[in-house]
Curated annotation (Swiss-Prot):
Organism this protein belongs to: Caenorhabditis elegans
Keywords, alphabetical: Developmental protein, Differentiation, Oogenesis
Domain of life of the source: Eukaryota
Subcellular location: Cytoplasmic granule
One cellular-component annotation, GO: P granule
GO annotation (BP), single: oogenesis
Record-given protein name: P granule abnormality protein 2
């Protein structure tokens, strides 16, 4: 009989011949296996170490022979039955009848039915003469089938690693329970090989396989429930658990920081699933003293508007919206022209971005539990959205200039740069505000970038072109002083002005300085001159 074709397939780093449907199930159910193993197929959960109880034969067969399997899938499942030993030989024969109904047959059927060792060895000799990978698989399969004891079977299974089929070897060792004290180091090497193969694309399963299941705390359980369909009760429970500082001493600065970033992470999670109502609920639930510690000084005053602004960007970067509509509320648009407010907003955004660090919570929990999109992809888009928000605030008034645009190497090509710039102009600089230094005005659409980034980079835009009047340009040091609220010292040497200001500042006691400058920092007024 002509040998069956034995292929090696790769699913997200998992190379396999014997268990392709197990690998495929793993690819689509990573989070289920890692965080809700009780709801996953027990065969898969057992292989990755999520559960201790071994699967039943039926649970294994459900993976080996899925419904509507084609002849190739059935033939591969029959190979796995032979490798799994005598307990599965009856299933091997029964599934051959199903294969016959599709006008196919397994190449080892006659030899296995009679268990004619000469026929089996003859097949093995012929397969060794062929140089292809599928012939090597057949040779190893025959040797596993003919092995006389557990030790010999283990050695033959290890030969699969020479074909980079470490995953198949690990599954067979696990199901056949071949690991013992003598071969523990070899099994560990195979396990590490599998971890290395899946680490990049399946980090949760790699972590599970390497470290085993961890005891899930209450916060992790709550985080694992999708927020998108949740009520405020779930968020309130999360906030209450995180804010429970009974075990945190007043002097534990690092633990307080950790608590802050956990709460910020919750705020981000609610926004990225477009549940801004839960974001507001979470803010109201956080105790005032903790909230003031998270967002000190000016930050607390602009917090809600900043979160609204960021929420709009999340919707665009996560493809929930195609336009930058209603990018910022009017109060935000008016406030952002103040240098100290911009500095405070950037502080909020930087903190929210840092809260995405995987070490904020004790266990790895995806940002959007149950999402079909990889957590790494989602995290990347969320970080890009926050980076975009920081860029908008930092480049306020010059967002269309060449220097500003060149700071967008991270920008997602799916988001039109032209539309972003236009939206900033509409949402932020179209508010009619006039005072002694700033004159915002709406400008014609044609003056913006025409959808061509290269064209914009070749053009040196003027402040008028991008909606900012010439009055924004600080022409001399006297005007800088007027903006900062200093008196006109134009007749005195600049050195004396600086000296006079410095001496007065030094005479102010520390508590007053903190009250005046809030969370911005006592030493930061001088360092922020670049914003003006």
């Amino acid at each position: 009989m002509k040998p069956c074709k034995r292929e090696i397939v790769d699913f997200d780093g998992i190379r396999t011949h014997f268990f392709p449907n197990l690998a495929l199930y793993t690819c689509y159910n990573e989070e289920l296996i890692a965080h809700h193993s009780e709801n996953a197929n027990r065969f898969t959960s057992y292989v990755f170490g999520a559960v201790e109880d071994s699967p039943t034969e039926q649970e294994i067969l459900e993976i080996l022979f899925p419904e509507n399997a084609n002849p190739e899938a059935i033939s591969t499942g029959m190979d796995a039955c032979l490798a799994l030993g005598e307990n599965f030989l009856s299933h091997y024969k029964s599934f051959n009848a199903r294969l016959n109904r599709q006008n196919h047959s397994h190449d080892l059927l006659d030899a296995v039915q009679e268990f004619d060792e000469k026929k089996i060895l003859a097949i093995s000799r012929k397969s060794r003469l062929r140089k292809s990978a599928d012939s090597k698989i057949l040779t190893i399969l025959v040797n596993i089938l003919l092995s006389e004891n557990q030790e010999e079977k283990f050695m033959e299974i290890c030969e699969l690693c020479s074909l980079d089929l470490d995953f198949d070897a690990f599954v067979l060792i696990k199901i056949l329970q071949l690991e013992n004290e003598e071969n523990a180091e070899e099994v560990q090497i195979i396990r590490e090989n599998v971890v290395d193969q899946i680490l990049e694309q399946k980090p949760f399963l790699a972590h599970l396989l390497k470290n085993g299941p961890e005891k899930i705390d209450e916060i992790t359980k709550l985080l694992s429930v999708p927020i998108i369909g949740s009520s405020s009760n779930q968020i309130n429970q999360l906030i209450t658990k995180i804010c429970d500082s009974s075990e945190i001493s007043d002097t534990a600065v690092e633990e307080h920081y950790h608590q802050n970033f956990k709460l910020m992470n919750i705020l981000v999670r609610t926004m990225i699933v477009d549940r801004f109502d839960l974001t507001i609920d979470a803010l109201e639930q956080i105790p005032v003293e903790i909230k003031n510690r998270m967002f000190p000084g000016i930050r607390i005053r602009v917090l809600q508007d900043t979160l609204h602004f960021l929420h709009q960007l999340f919707k665009v970067f996560l493809n929930e919206s195609q336009k930058f509509d209603n990018l910022a509320p009017q109060s935000f648009a008016k406030a952002i022209k103040n240098v100290w407010v911009r500095h405070a907003i950037i502080g909020i955004l930087d903190s929210l971005k840092f809260s995405l660090n995987k070490d904020v919570f004790n266990q790895l929990v995806p940002l959007i539990p149950g999402s079909q999109v990889s957590n790494d992809v989602i995290s990347g888009k969320v970080e890009n959205a926050i980076s975009c928000a920081i860029w908008i605030v930092k480049t306020f008034g010059t967002e269309g200039s060449r220097d500003s645009i060149e700071k967008l190497p991270w920008f997602d090509s799916s988001v039109e740069l032209t539309e972003l710039i236009n939206s900033i102009e509409i949402a932020v600089t179209s508010v009619e505000v006039e005072d002694q230094t700033v004159n915002f005005r709406k400008i014609p659409q044609k003056d913006w970038l025409d959808g061509n980034l290269q064209k914009a980079l070749k053009t040196e835009p003027t402040s008028e072109k991008f909606g900012i009047s010439n009055s924004l340009k600080i022409k001399d040091e006297n005007q800088r002083n007027q903006i900062r609220g200093f008196k006109d010292n134009s007749k005195e040497p600049n050195a004396k002005v600086s000296a006079r200001f410095g001496s007065k500042f030094q005479r102010v006691d520390s508590s007053t300085k903190r009250r005046l400058f809030g969370g911005v920092g006592v030493g930061e007024p001088r360092n922020c001159r670049g914003f003006l």
